[in-house]
Amino acid sequence: MIFNIDKETMPREKIREIQLSRLQDLCRRVYANVPFYRRSFDEKGIKPSDVQSLDDLKFLPFTLKQDMRNNYPYGLFAVPMEMIQRIHASSGTTGKATVVGYTKRDIETWAECAARSLAAAGATANDIVQVSYGYGLFTGGLGAHYGAERLGATVIPMSGGSTKRQVQLMRDFGATVLCCTPSYALHLHDAGLEIGINIKDLPLRLGVFGAEPWTEEMRREIEDKLGITATNIYGLSEIMGPGVSQSCAKEQHGMHIWEDHFLPEIIDPVSGEILPEGSTGELVITTLTKQGIPLVRYRTRDITSLNYTPCSCGRTHVRMNRITGRSDDMLIIRGVNVFPSQIESLLLEVQGVSPHYQLILTRENNLDYVEVQVELDGAMFSDAIKDLQQREQRIQKGIKEFLGVTTKVRLVEPHSIPRSEGKAVRVIDRRVMQSR
């Protein structure tokens, strides 16, 4: 099913025409309304009127996540606050959230893009969609919710947690589509078996999974265990949320980016130069229609490539291939962005621990876990066991409150964490080894 056949199947020439018109309008809007962009354009000697073709995109400045933090909370908003209808946010390395504002039209656009994505995955108005992404400041839950409602489907707004109850209600309510992280889908399967429910025996037929990296092997495992078709949705809160792109049920080779709203590029992550078509590099996205917080050439840090060959599904919008990595050190744990430096800043505030630590990432029962190993300083190592346990609990509580991620903290003896002559090894990711 194609949700918006006129927009999703328009000729490539028409897409480029729309993109240029909207890019020119975007440049005028941000130059007039966002001081940060006026300065950025002026520093490069560019005026909005200089943008005469899509080839001129390469002359425009990049926008970084740090720019959003530096302008916290509303410095990049391009409209008055009375036009902002919704605020979402994600965490950052400094503790300041990355804030995104949505106007009424932005939310309508989000619903449109998410509906296109669900339809591309194979969902219809006759489906019952269980949304098991988190709701709240995280964009996952409401994004899938908006899309399913716009599609005309029935929505079960489950959010995250209460895993066994989720499986029970999936059975009782007859859910046919599941929206969550891929790791949580496998966790639901295992939890169901513990209470005598095999999801394979339920009406569930389709999964729309995202918010964390996952492999083709994991997709096959999900399809085998749950007995469904597993599709890949992509999005990030800075750009909009889930629904920026989606793999289609027809081919499952890449995710269609809705190019009438998002203008993608692939650049060399080191030089910033635009790479030739088909090259692998960092994905950069310009938001063409966002009103609240429009972004020019936003560097996503996600590594992928673009595929412009025609798709048998009939959609003409470019496909991005599966994300293969990131150009920064951000970790994604159960859909939550976590930087090692965030945890480091918390540890350095705790009396009695040293600055030597490691994050051990593991995967058990298809869920990611983080163990924080941090060395005690010599003076504290002889403390009573009870005192050490209380200190571990305080650190765990601080990480949970600050980052929204549950961790296990283990205080270890001085000099037990290996030192390196070069860059310190802060992260040991055993998830990859365990998935082999």
Regions found by a protein language model. Name each.
Residues 128, 195-214:
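Conserved helix-loop-beta element of the AMP-binding
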Residues 205, 214-310:
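Conserved AMP-binding/adenylate-forming
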Residues 185-203, 220-224:
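Adenylate-forming
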Residues 178, 289-403, 422:
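AMP-binding/adenylate-forming catalytic core of the ANL superfamily
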Residues 30, 90-93, 129, 178, ...:
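Conserved S/T- and glycine-rich ATP-binding loop of Class I adenylate-forming
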Residues 123-127:
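Short helix-loop-beta connector
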Residues 1-89, 94-112, 116-120, 366-374, ...:
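Nucleotide 5′-phosphate-binding alpha/beta core
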